[in-house]
Amino acid sequence: MTLHTMFPTQVYVSHLRQAGWLRFNRELLRECQQVREYDVAGQKWCRDNYPGGYTSYGSLCHMQKMSSTFATLEQKINRHVKAYVRALEYDMSGRELTMTDCWINIMPQHVVHGLHIHPTSMISGTYYVQTPKGCSGLKFEDPRLDSFMATPPRKADCRPENKPWITVPAQAGNVA
C-alpha cells in the first residue's frame, strides 16, 4: 500500500529571538496598554462585543502604519513570513507580500477569542507580546471538517497530522 499526504496545512511557529527582543517586547507591551487606554472607539466596541478584553481590530487596525514600534515588529515578522513562503514553495516572482492589517488583542484571564477565519488573507498570524503562565494556546482546526460529518472520531493517540484540530502553545516572543 502507498499512502500519500496531500493538501497538508502547514503551521509555522518560531521565536522572534533577535538581540534585544525582551526590551522590544516591553516597549511593545507599554504601547499596547497606551493604545487601549486612549482608544475610545475600541473600548466602546469591546464593551459590547469583547467582554473583559480589548481589541483595536475595528478602530485601529493598521498599527504598523501608525507606530514606529509596530513598524519595527512588521520588519521582524517579515523575515518569518519570507521563510514560511519559501517552505510552502510559493512562486512569488513579480509578487510582493505586504502586511495589510495589524491590530492589538489584549485577553485577560477568562476572555476568549472565538473561532474565525481570515478569508482575504494569504498568510495570517499572531505575535505574542505577553502570555500568562498556563494560558490557552492558538487552536487550528482542519478546514475540511464540514466535509467529514459522517467520519468516526479519531483515535486518542493518532498522529498530530490526523487530528481534527491542534493547539499551538501561546508563548511570549513567538510568531505563529
Locate the predicted segments by residue.
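Non-heme Fe(II)/2-oxoglutarate
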Residues: M1-D91
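Aromatic-enriched hydrophobic runs in primary sequence
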Residues: Y12-Q18, Y84, R95-E96, V112, ...
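Residue-identity detector for glycine
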Residues: G20, G42, G52-G53, G58, ...
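Active-site region of the double-stranded beta-helix
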Residues: H62, S68-T98, P108-M122, V129-K133
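Catalytic core of non-heme Fe(II) oxygenases with the double-stranded beta-helix
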Residues: T98-A176
